[in-house]
Amino acid sequence: MTQPSAIDDILAEHAGLETQLADPTLHNDPSAARRVGKRFAELAPIMATYRKLESARADLTAARELAADDASFAAEVPELERQVDELEQALADLLAPRDPHDGDDVVLEVKSGEGGEESALFAADLARMYMRYAERRGWRVEVLDATVSDLGGYKEATLSIKSRDAARDGVWSRFKFEGGVHRVQRVPVTESQGRIHTSAAGVLIYPEPDEVAEVQIDESDLRIDVYRSSGKGGQGVNTTDSAVRITHLPTGIVVTCQNERSQLQNKARAMQVLAARLQALAEEQAEQEAAAGRASQIRTVDRSERIRTYNFPENRITDHRIGYKSHNLDAVLDGDLDALLDALGKADREARMAAE
């Protein structure tokens, strides 16, 4: 059974949010309006399930009363009892403690590691995999910065991935387990003897704060450098000093952005990425003992720390954390990630329940 106090709190909060959203003055503060709208969307599945449960309970009560006078109604009772049980469990699951960042957008970084050009090409494959998955979900993807290798791979790249609408389960809820070392086994394009090589690329992922102002950043802690954006030539290349590099001196975190049209826009996007990284760092430092609460992420790209292997000769993908295997590597790299991400989410929920 659901704890009455838990759902009562949700009902009261939902009513309060409805009142705020109906107030025209709320939209005088766009930041507050986004925050209220996002929370309202997060509560929507809970409210929908609660209303279905209340309706099913009323139907069950009525069926039992009718069955007392007319035995022909008794046949309906078991099915209604089953519906009530299922909805009670669904509501309990929705009310269970969850990652507070699940509704957030993300900043995702891919970095090449061991393997030279082959590693950079694989890093680009990973970036495309996430982009294609995002396209399937209708999310917006922006490449904030990229260092391209001689063969067109990514030595490193930073992506911003945003959902188009506020939702209980946002980008972070799907991608939060992707941080770590990804290993590839295949014949590189640079291999003339047809031998299979093993190389690695790393993924780092951070929930993005709704507003940079949510993270305290002292301007005196920043070194901001501007330089000319790099490119391959042609009309689209920005020939002014519009690229921005921000160094956060206390932590040594460096963020660059060069894909926007102006220095001001690049600085704003770089500050968003910096805020996401500082938020993640602060949470990691505050929760060192709670590693099970979120996926541990790489700090060095080392094949020995792999979370997943992509085996091209066998068309197989293996996630070593949960023992997941499938032979549809080509589809996965084309963005067909749901089965894998669902399995990771299920394993995480089971681990959380076992720890309680």
Swiss-Prot record:
GO MF annotation, one: translation release factor activity, codon specific
Pfam families: PCRF (PF03462), RF-1 (PF00472)
Chain's role: Peptide chain release factor 1 directs the termination of translation in response to the peptide chain termination codons UAG and UAA.
Modifications the protein undergoes after translation, according to the UniProt entry: Methylated by PrmC. Methylation increases the termination efficiency of RF1.
Organism: Nocardia farcinica (strain IFM 10152)
GO cellular component: cytoplasm
Designated name of the protein: Peptide chain release factor 1
Subcellular location: Cytoplasm
Entry's family note: Belongs to the prokaryotic/mitochondrial release factor family.
Residue list for modification N5-methylglutamine: 235
This protein's UniProt keywords: Cytoplasm, Methylation, Protein biosynthesis
SMART domains: PCRF (SM00937)
